[in-house]
Amino acid sequence: MSTKPHLIGFIGLDSYDLILFLAKYLENLGQSVLIADYSKFGRLSYCIPAPVSLNPKTDLIRYNNMDFLRHDYESFQREEYNYILIDFGWDISQEVIHSCDFLYIITDLQQQNMEHILHMNLPNISVYILLKNFFHINNRNNAKDYFVENHFNFKKCYLFPTSVKDLENMVMLQYYHDIKLHKVTKPLRNLIHTILIDNLDFDEKEVLSIKRFHKTK
């Protein structure tokens, strides 16, 4: 009997490094993963090399034991996958957003981004805020208080650490397409562990054991 896949949506600032590394973790945990890029400028698409014989805008691309597409995932056999990760960018007009099990909103403390999120008409599902932290201080409470005071409904606010090394990794992903877990910085790895264990209910020991394979995976 086929099982409905878990749909996880990502909204807001660039987060294709998180999406790709999370997908790679899921693959290491024995899960079949489909990644869909619904963002306006196809920011995640640049990370996936397409064979000459395939059109990344219309064809399903198989890369690094994961499937990737740039268009409507519903035209494929969804039941084949355990998880479907969707990058929406800032576009929340996509109907599929209402089918997501979780939504992760990626923002920083810039006021225009925070205010934009307040005006989003999001479905009544589990929403998590990932705060991009470009500083050596914990700004999570600032963001949390802002959204609470403005009656924005979310389950939890996590720090999404972003160092110079993380920014370098993002550029390298687009140019060299090297999705290797040993390249993940420790703070980002900790965030991925939190998502897998706390939100997706994977066994903690199993998740932490993946670090043994970082040099080859």
Briefly describe each language-model feature range.
Residues 31-33, 84, 103, 127-128:
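Hydrophobic anchor at the start of a short beta-strand
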Residues 23, 27-28, 97:
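Gly/Ala-rich phosphate-binding loop of Rossmann-like dinucleotide-binding domains
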Residues 107-114, 162-165:
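Short, acidic/turn-prone active-site loops that include or flank metal/cofactor-
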Residues 115-126:
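Conserved C-terminal guanine-recognition region of P-loop GTPase G domains, centered on the G4
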